[in-house]
Amino acid sequence: MEEKKVNIRIASPEDAEKLLAIYAPYVEHTAITFEYEVPSLLEFRERICHVLEKYPYLAAEVDGQITGYAYVGVFHDREAYDWCVETSIYVDQSCRKMGIGGKLHHALEEVLKLQGILNLNACIAYPEEEDEYLTKNSVEFHRHLGYDMVGEFHNCGYKFDRWYHMVWMEKMIGEHRSGQDFPKNFPQIREEAESILSKL
């Protein structure tokens, strides 16, 4: 079977309905996210707008249809953490095993390098034993992308009447040095980011 091309572009608030349709099953049927209730369309649109003020929010398309998305958020509020972000990737559950998540992450990483981000951090739900709500696949996915496990919190997430662990994984994408320039906000490098995404 011919592999379909995955196009990565910058998401917009107008994509909120389609992106929310991808996210909702993760809330309702998995422990991949510890969120209990599916956010409203308005709230989800506001989340996209908030991210884009500072960071990239990317959408993957196959044959013109959105099949996944990726974005980052603030790791911690204090200024000394500005070079660190927390990553999130969600792929339409009917489109898994197509390499979409990996391509989204690669694109995200390239844009974050433009901004001057150095540390990628992933907060991942992790089961003691795999069940119908949560597997260990996300940890393996991140290992494949070059992340290392750096911490584990035990029984800190309660969903579907079960307790789950949470792990932190990290990946360094830049050089840590003295005299470090502060990262740029996404709008400052958006045009350059669009150029890079068009070539991926």
Where do the model's predicted regions map?
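Conserved GNAT acetyl-CoA-binding A-motif
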Residues: 112-134
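Acetyl-CoA-dependent GNAT
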Residues: 39-84, 88-94, 115, 172-175
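A short, internal acetyl-CoA/4′-phosphopantetheine-binding micro-motif in the GNAT/acyltransferase core
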Residues: 88-96, 124-129
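Conserved catalytic-core motifs of GNAT/GCN5-like acyltransferases
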Residues: 123-125, 139, 143-162, 174-175, ...
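A short beta-loop-alpha structural element at the N-terminal edge
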Residues: 7-19
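Glycine-rich phosphate/pyrophosphate-binding loop shared by adenosine-nucleotide-utilizing enzymes
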Residues: 6, 65-69, 164
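Conserved acetyl-CoA-binding loop-helix of GNAT-fold acetyltransferases
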Residues: 97-113, 135-140
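Conserved GNAT-fold acetyl-CoA-binding loop/helix
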Residues: 20, 24-47
